[in-house]
């Protein structure tokens, strides 16, 4: 005899499970009442439908209606006007049925007794906020019962311009996804599979979608264009809009490259400019001096030498510069950072091109030659000064 040994009787656990199941069914029934606005009672072969106001009155005066009302309604069978998106045969004890009138509105949804469901069933509900929507359809939603292999249909129905009120409880978690596209005539929600604990079969739920679609930024396209990235939450872009101004290179994919030198670039705009360094093309001339440049940014930086504009001030000393590159090099004076050193004399320089120019004093290299007289110079600025003075 164990005496005071601790144990968990199966009957106690079963009572707790039944209590939890009853709470979940009550919550589902409340949600259906919010959807339909009606309460259904069935006696023998006759179905009677009451509005919420009528049901409140009957409940308050139930002593007068004992013969026509039951405390726990039995399961109702689908009427002739019922509409299902999936007509597969499912056991009656695992099914919850929604019926509608001939006008297409909701009329009845009966909670039924079923085996204990998995704890923490998550129901995802989608609401629509777009303008002039005429029809929104929701695909059938199924859940997986813990310890089983067969998906169980929960509800399959059509909504006509109705919004589900937010209903928050401890057992059911609702997440709303809004469809913001203007003048949308048909909004369809694709299912996403979710794995319920203790099962091996993915279960479709509504409201989310996984996709990988390249971003084709175009003002003429009428379709939404999600970016080339893996979407884990449902993301809807407004028509003819682009959230990100540049393409994102997906993981595992190489950036674009040229066919000539094999150099890689992260942006297609950089790829289009790079071949000009091989061909020598400079299609952007300066309106002041006529000097040409390979891109607009270089032209804009050069143009500041004519206007005297220096929009990049140093936060330490207040000195201004015409280029952000010059400002970056200047800041190294304050920080003491010296990245480039000469291998011959050990002298430090703020940038690599200053080091390269200095290194020619050791090698004697003069790569800049005058096309008029053939004289060579080690620095391009010396060549430019020679042309102005001599030629």
UniProtKB/Swiss-Prot annotation:
GO cellular component terms, A-Z: nucleus
Q: Which GO terms describe its molecular function?
A: DNA-binding transcription factor activity, RNA polymerase II-specific; RNA polymerase II cis-regulatory region sequence-specific DNA binding; zinc ion binding
Protein name as annotated: Oocyte zinc finger protein XlCOF7.2
Where is it mostly found?
A: nucleus
Looking up Gene3D superfamilies in the UniProt record yields:
Classic Zinc Finger (3.30.160.60)
Give the signal peptide range. none
Q: Which family does it belong to?
A: Belongs to the krueppel C2H2-type zinc-finger protein family.
Biological process GO annotation list?
Answer: regulation of transcription by RNA polymerase II
Give the subcellular location. Answer: Nucleus
Q: Which UniProt keywords apply?
A: DNA-binding, Metal-binding, Nucleus, Repeat, Transcription, Transcription regulation, Zinc, Zinc-finger
InterPro entries for the chain: Znf_C2H2_sf, Znf_C2H2_type
- Give, as residue ranges, the zinc fingers classified C2H2-type: 284-306, 312-334, 340-362, 368-391
Q: What does this protein do?
A: May be involved in transcriptional regulation.
User: Which Pfam families does its entry note?
Assistant: zf-C2H2
């Amino acid at each position: 005899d164990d005496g005071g040994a601790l144990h968990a009787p199966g009957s106690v656990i079963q009572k707790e499970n039944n209590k939890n199941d009853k709470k979940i069914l009550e919550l589902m029934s409340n949600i259906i009442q919010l959807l339909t606005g009606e309460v259904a009672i069935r006696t023998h072969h006759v179905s009677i439908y009451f509005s919420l106001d009528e049901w409140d009155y009957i409940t308050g005066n139930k002593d007068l209606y004992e013969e026509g009302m039951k405390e726990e309604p039995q399961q109702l069978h689908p009427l002739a006007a019922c509409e299902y998106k999936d007509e597969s045969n499912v056991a009656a004890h695992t099914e919850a049925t929604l019926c509608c009138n001939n006008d297409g509105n909701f009329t009845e949804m009966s909670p039924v007794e079923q085996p204990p469901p998995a704890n923490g069933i998550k129901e995802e509900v989608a609401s629509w906020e777009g303008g002039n929507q005429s029809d929104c359809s929701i695909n059938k939603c199924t859940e997986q019962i813990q310890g089983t292999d067969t998906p169980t249909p929960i509800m399959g129905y059509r909504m006509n311009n109705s919004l589900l009120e937010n209903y928050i409880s401890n057992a059911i978690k609702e997440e709303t996804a809004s469809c913001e596209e203007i003048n949308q005539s048909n909004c369809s929600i694709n299912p996403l599979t979710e794995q319920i604990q203790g099962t091996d079969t993915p279960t479709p739920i509504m409201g989310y979608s996984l996709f990988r679609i390249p971003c084709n930024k175009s003002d003429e396209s009428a379709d939404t264009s999600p970016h080339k990235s893996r979407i884990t939450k449902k993301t809807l872009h407004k028509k003819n809009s682009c959230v990100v101004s540049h393409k994102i290179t997906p993981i595992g994919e190489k950036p674009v490259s040229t066919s000539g030198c094999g150099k890689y670039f992260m942006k297609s705009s950089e790829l289009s400019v790079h071949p000009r360094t091989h061909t020598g093309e400079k299609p952007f001339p300066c309106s002041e001096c006529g000097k040409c440049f390979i891109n607009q940014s270089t032209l804009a930086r050069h143009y500041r030498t004519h206007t005297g504009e220096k929009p990049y001030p140093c936060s330490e000393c207040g000195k201004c510069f015409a280029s952000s590159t010059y400002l970056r090099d200047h800041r190294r004076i304050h920080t003491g950072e010296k990245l480039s050193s000469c291998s011959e004399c050990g002298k430090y320089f703020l940038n690599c091109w200053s080091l390269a120019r200095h290194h020619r004093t050791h090698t004697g290299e003069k790569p800049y030659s005058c096309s008029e007289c053939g004289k060579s110079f080690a620095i391009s600025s010396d060549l430019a000064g020679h042309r102005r003075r001599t030629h």
